Amino acid sequence: MSKTIVLSVGEATRTLTEIQSTADRQIFEEKVGPLVGRLRLTASLRQNGAKTAYRVNLKLDQADVVDCSTSVCGELPKVRYTQVWSHDVTIVANSTEASRKSLYDLTKSLVATSQVEDLVVNLVPLGR
């Protein structure tokens, strides 16, 4: 059974299904709906060289179709994913589960603020 992630935004629900998984990286893609606009999420968890910290990276890409009739990629259109969002978190390796949960809660709270929404949506620097 494939793993899935369900994203609920307003009235819409979008389901991403795991298509690839390794020890430190998973890729989830949207499999239903129009091809243009489908989402792909890449999640990775890697330890730094000194093994003192972990880096969590989430990257969201959105599908578009490239017209190949006028280029060298052949006759048929091809799907191209373009990064539309990413989020990086660094976690101290010897942290406790409680401190990591607190970091997660703080991150979730920060991203939900109107100031961060204004920064992301309207490109208004924080504090202005």
UniProtKB/Swiss-Prot annotation:
Changing residue 40 to L: Loss of translational repressor activity. Keywords: Capsid protein, Disulfide bond, RNA-binding, T=3 icosahedral capsid protein, Translation regulation, Virion. One of its GO terms (biological process) is regulation of translation. GO terms for cellular component: T=3 icosahedral viral capsid. InterPro entries: Phage_PP7_CP, Phage_RNA-type_capsid. Changing residue 53 to L/P: Loss of translational repressor activity. It comes from the Viruses. Its main location: virion. GO terms for molecular function: identical protein binding; RNA binding. Changing residue 90 to A/V: Loss of translational repressor activity. SUPFAM superfamilies: RNA bacteriophage capsid protein (SSF55405). It is found in: Virion. Capsid protein self-assembles to form an icosahedral capsid with a T=3 symmetry, about 26 nm in diameter, and consisting of 89 capsid proteins dimers (178 capsid proteins). Involved in viral genome encapsidation through the interaction between a capsid protein dimer and the multiple packaging signals present in the RNA genome. Acts as a translational repressor of viral replicase synthesis late in infection. This latter function is the result of capsid protein interaction with an RNA hairpin which contains the replicase ribosome-binding site. Belongs to the Leviviricetes capsid protein family. Homodimer. The dimers in the capsid are covalently linked with disulfide bridges. The homodimers binds to the viral RNA via an operator hairpin, but also to many other RNA sequences in the viral genome; this interaction probably shifts the virus from the replicative to the assembly phase and ensures specific encapsidation of the viral genome. This is Capsid protein. It comes from Pseudomonas phage PP7.
